[in-house]
A protein has these predicted regions:
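PRPP-associated nucleotide enzymes
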Residues: 1-317
Length: 317
């Protein structure tokens, strides 16, 4: 999969070891040898155990929970790589933490997503590959190239194989309408859009629903599920508007904090929750209604194309 005479090296952080190995396996490449330790006070130590001089290096590390630990580890991995004279350093973040803090909703707040973009660049990253950012505008926070992948096509393929009848695609809020419309075209289904009102620290109320869902089978498209509160609220609204109580949910990033997995699995109107392995799903979070799809091939192909100086966006056009 890699062109001759170009030294590409893959390295994995500790945030999602299985996905890293699956990506390396798809590319037919070994993961590079790197030592990652924690000192007794919690500080992170990194040492590359092989030469990376002149390499086209890719560091795979999602900034999923524990977010700060994984983020700092990634920054140190990038810094050590830069100091070891790699030719190009690409940070591969299957999940981009802090993406929900992309604007100021209240006075005296930070725009943390912009800060993270700045520190990734300052640490030495030349390029970033990520997937389904919470807000497309985050791409503009970077002064280096960013390849923005999406799992929408995977979800479309999944539901085409299921051959559900009388489907309606649901965007829980205005922010996902663009991707939802693309899924509408792929599945030849109508669209419904919810309108959210956000309260402090995650409480969400859907105040209106545009589109006809009565008697239809909804497919909700989201970028992430954290506590599950927004999804449960969306499900409640759909049921109130007369949909079939067989609701399918697809979300790229299964953060799934607190009791989210039980809230989703135990809800009688939810038929299935489809997530990807951008974030590892711990054994204790596995439930019958939760299905996990792999993004290893997608990231492997993106890495291959970056290395070959080929178009990445054409994967999704």
């Amino acid at each position: 999969m890699v062109r001759e005479n170009t030294e590409i090296k893959l390295f994995a952080g500790t945030g999602n070891p299985k996905l890293c190995h699956d990506i390396a396996g798809w590319l037919g490449l070994p993961l590079g040898d790197v030592r990652i330790d924690r000192f007794s006070d919690g500080e992170t130590y990194v040492q590359y155990k092989e030469s990376v001089r002149g390499a086209d290096a890719f560091i795979i590390q999602p900034t999923c929970p524990p977010v700060d630990t994984n983020l700092v580890e990634l920054l140190i991995l990038i810094d050590a790589m830069r100091r070891a004279s790699a030719d190009r350093i690409t940070a591969v973040l299957p999940y981009f933490g802090y993406a929900r803090q992309e604007k100021k909703d209240r006075p005296r707040e930070a725009i943390t997503a912009k800060l993270i973009a700045d520190v990734l660049t300052a640490s030495g990253a030349d390029r970033v590959i990520t997937m389904d950012l919470h807000a497309d505008a985050i791409q503009g926070f970077f002064n280096i190239p960013l390849d923005h992948l999406t799992a929408r096509g995977m979800f479309a393929d999944y539901f085409q194989q299921k051959a559900l009848e009388n489907v309606v695609i649901v965007s829980p809020d205005e922010g996902r309408v663009k991707q939802a419309r693309k899924l509408v075209r792929q599945l030849n289904a109508p669209l419904a859009v919810g309108y959210k009102h956000h309260e402090m620290h995650g409480h969400t109320e859907i105040t209106d629903l545009a589109g006809d869902v009565k008697g239809k089978t909804p497919i909700i498209l989201e970028d992430m599920i954290t506590t599950g509160g927004s999804i449960i609220e969306c499900v409640r609204t759909l049921v109130e508007h007369g949909c079939k109580p067989e609701i399918h949910i697809c979300a790229t990033h299964g953060v799934l904090t607190m009791d989210a997995v039980d809230r989703l699995n135990d809800h009688p109107a939810i038929a299935e929750v489809i997530i990807t392995d951008s974030i590892p799903l711990a054994p204790e979070k596995r439930r019958p209604k939760i299905t996990q799809l792999s993004v290893a091939a997608m990231f492997g192909e993106a890495i291959h194309r970056v290395n070959q100086d080929m178009s990445v966006s054409s994967l999704f056009d």
